[in-house]
Amino acid sequence: MSTRPHPESARIIREARQAAGLTQLELAEKLGVTIGTIGYYERGAGQPKTDNLFALCDILHIRPADLLSADT
């Protein structure tokens, strides 16, 4: 996970999770991470590692490129 702030990717993840009707806990369970990790992503404190990135995008029906280019 990167430690650089990622406000735009945080917004994309949060809005996609809400649009999917998932709570942070439900998303964490589907992704196999803690709820704290989801909060970390949604606060923009960091981004998922590559393996979690693709799984997260699959669950939320978003493109990895949207997250990777959001804060550049």
Where on the chain are the PLM-derived regions?
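DNA major-groove recognition helix of helix-turn-helix/homeodomain DNA-binding modules
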Residues: 32, 51-66
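Residues that mark the N-terminal boundary/hinge immediately upstream of a DNA-recognition element
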Residues: 12, 23, 49-52, 63
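Alpha-helical residues within the helix-turn-helix
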Residues: 18, 29, 58
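Short alpha-helical DNA-recognition segment
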Residues: 21-40
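Short, charged recognition helix plus adjacent turn
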Residues: 1-4, 40, 58, 68-72
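A short, Lys/Arg-rich alpha-helix, primarily the initiator
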Residues: 1-19
